[in-house]
Amino acid sequence: MLDNIKIGLQYCTPKHALTRLVGKLASLEAGKLTTAIIRWFIGQYKVDMSEARNPDPAAYSTFNHFFIRELKEGARPINNDDNIISHPADACVSQLGPIKEGRLFQAKGHYFDACELLGGDKALAEEFVDGDFATLYLSPRDYHRVHMPCDGTLRQMIYVPGDLFSVNPLTAQNVPNLFARNERVVCIFDTAHGPIAQVLVGATIVGSIETVWAGTVTPPTGPEVRRWDYPATGTQAIVLKKGQEMGRFKLGSTVINLFPKDMVRFVEAMKPEQPTRMGEPYAELDSSEKE
């Protein structure tokens, strides 16, 4: 009954207005009040500040500064095996598996469409037909910077407008087409082994999605899909190394990765509800890709 009420509130709440309000509040410099809120948040969600570059809550002038805190150097060693794809974020595995008939598994009884997820680009979706996907949920306690799972050259960024449902396990199990209806930023990278998609999905009170090359992508929001194309070579090419930061959430959300057919094989530890740490092994390149 309580779960039904929570889901009902998701549909009734003015989520965009609430998110804008929370984003503004999280950017306020309120001195001791900000510090008190940060301390409460740390205690409430059991945030491990020993890993932070600056573990002192009073050092953060706004809640957003705290939320996108950097980690100490060496806190997340990057697996340097060229045949290993590394985790892009501290998170929890929501779902993973094959892309079947252009659809990705969301939760029991729910699937969502790869083409819709990618902003309705059929040609782009074709690149991932019969491929593999993983959905990673970043909880409030997690480190909220997102990194590259392998070396890649940015080909395209797509902003897709949408709703702002919460993306926690309860809503994933109860809101149809959740990840393809929420606002999101799709990043397509070309790698030595094929293209990959890294999709940053917005949610209720996610005040901002940013990338290292474009800064804040949202807000502002808009009614239209927007696309940016990037050169593959030359001084304007955006080339990011494995483990390098590529984006961040100001208040957390979800990362979805898409891989082409036969490119990767997820490591054995990759299972739903399994915690992940950025830089640790995520998937192995398929044996045919290694040759």
Curated annotation (Swiss-Prot):
Subcellular location, principal: membrane
Q: How is it modified after translation?
A: Is synthesized initially as an inactive proenzyme. Formation of the active enzyme involves a self-maturation process in which the active site pyruvoyl group is generated from an internal serine residue via an autocatalytic post-translational modification. Two non-identical subunits are generated from the proenzyme in this reaction, and the pyruvate is formed at the N-terminus of the alpha chain, which is derived from the carboxyl end of the proenzyme.
Which EC number(s) does UniProt give? Answer: 4.1.1.65
Compartments, record wording: Cell membrane
Disulfide pattern: none
Site residues (Cleavage (non-hydrolytic)), renumbered to this chain: 252-253
Catalytic residues, per the record, are 90 (charge relay system), 147 (charge relay system), 253 (charge relay system), 253 (schiff-base intermediate with substrate)
Q: Which coenzymes or cofactors are required? A: pyruvate
Under which main EC class is this enzyme filed?
lyase
Q: Which GO terms describe its molecular function?
A: phosphatidylserine decarboxylase activity
| A GO CC annotation given for this chain | plasma membrane
- Answer whether the UniProt record assigns the keyword RNA-binding to this protein: no
Write down how the cofactor binds this protein: Binds 1 pyruvoyl group covalently per subunit.
Q: Pathway involvement?
A: Phospholipid metabolism; phosphatidylethanolamine biosynthesis; phosphatidylethanolamine from CDP-diacylglycerol: step 2/2
What keywords were assigned to this record?
A: Cell membrane, Decarboxylase, Lipid biosynthesis, Lipid metabolism, Lyase, Membrane, Phospholipid biosynthesis, Phospholipid metabolism, Pyruvate, Zymogen
Reaction catalysis annotation: a 1,2-diacyl-sn-glycero-3-phospho-L-serine + H(+) = a 1,2-diacyl-sn-glycero-3-phosphoethanolamine + CO2
The free-text function statement in the UniProt record for this protein reads:
Catalyzes the formation of phosphatidylethanolamine (PtdEtn) from phosphatidylserine (PtdSer).
User: What is its quaternary makeup?
Assistant: Heterodimer of a large membrane-associated beta subunit and a small pyruvoyl-containing alpha subunit.
Similarity comment: family membership: Belongs to the phosphatidylserine decarboxylase family. PSD-B subfamily. Prokaryotic type I sub-subfamily.
What protein am I looking at? Phosphatidylserine decarboxylase proenzyme
The species this protein belongs to is: Photobacterium profundum (strain SS9)
Q: Which gene specifies this protein's sequence?
A: psd
